[in-house]
């Protein structure tokens, strides 16, 4: 694990953040190796797999393809299937891994298809993906040949999914750190593009989060923000009393005008909403590759336009803005 994190640190390069970042990564490596039970279990499973060399990969497909069935023996195929199932829940995808279709909870390819046409070219850019999960979007970004595509994923099981996939893909410009955004040392103006998707509604202080994102971007850099929003054109936000769609950690759902005001106050300009989409069962659904509930369980069974708590059903907006 330390080698992987060291490589990420080297890819980021030198700067005033280097000492603090190296110290933090050493501590995170120790936690993943010695303390976190899930990470130790998943690392042991990875180490039991033979070294598999994929003869094929396709990052441009909606379903990312790694290897073919012919790359494995029958015994290796069963062992790989069992290992992949042990890494559940698979949230972001989908994938085809050596002929094994991993049908993830989210059809992340649908979100990417909605957002990608509106992005500034990613080639040669330093990119940050906050809450990168298994790295699906990082892998889609890699197809554009950025200088660096760096993910932040603090949840050890999801970070270990990234480690497993990168073990086969070996994408040199793609890296991931097991950190929360607020743990990242100050790196003023380092990134050209930041993706912050499906995270803002989990922030107790969205304004502070947006200010930090602005500080990490160079002037003129691009923020790609996707979040749950409240339907309507008034400048207001919903603060759920307890849970929203069975999630305890949802703090604010702004309308799009309210979100645009937040972005303006945090130091962004040229703010444009490029997509508003109600979450559908096609995009988020239960599959054998998760062992948790999914969207049908979060909605009122007698009225799918409402959550189980009676709030508006999930509506997501994608907003792109430039740092002033």
From Swiss-Prot:
The keyword Acetylation does not apply. Carboxy-S-adenosyl-L-methionine binds at residues 92, 106, 111, 131, 181-182, 197, 201, 316. It holds the Pfam family Methyltransf_9. Keywords: Transferase, tRNA processing. It catalyses: carboxy-S-adenosyl-L-methionine + 5-hydroxyuridine(34) in tRNA = 5-carboxymethoxyuridine(34) in tRNA + S-adenosyl-L-homocysteine + H(+). Its EC number is 2.5.1.-. One of its GO terms (molecular function) is transferase activity, transferring alkyl or aryl (other than methyl) groups. Homotetramer. Belongs to the class I-like SAM-binding methyltransferase superfamily. CmoB family. NCBIfam families: PRK15068.1 (NF011650), tRNA 5-methoxyuridine(34)/uridine 5-oxyacetic acid(34) synthase CmoB (TIGR00452). This is tRNA U34 carboxymethyltransferase. It comes from Syntrophotalea carbinolica (strain DSM 2380 / NBRC 103641 / GraBd1). The lineage of its organism: Bacteria, Pseudomonadati, Thermodesulfobacteriota, Desulfuromonadia, Desulfuromonadales. The gene is cmoB.
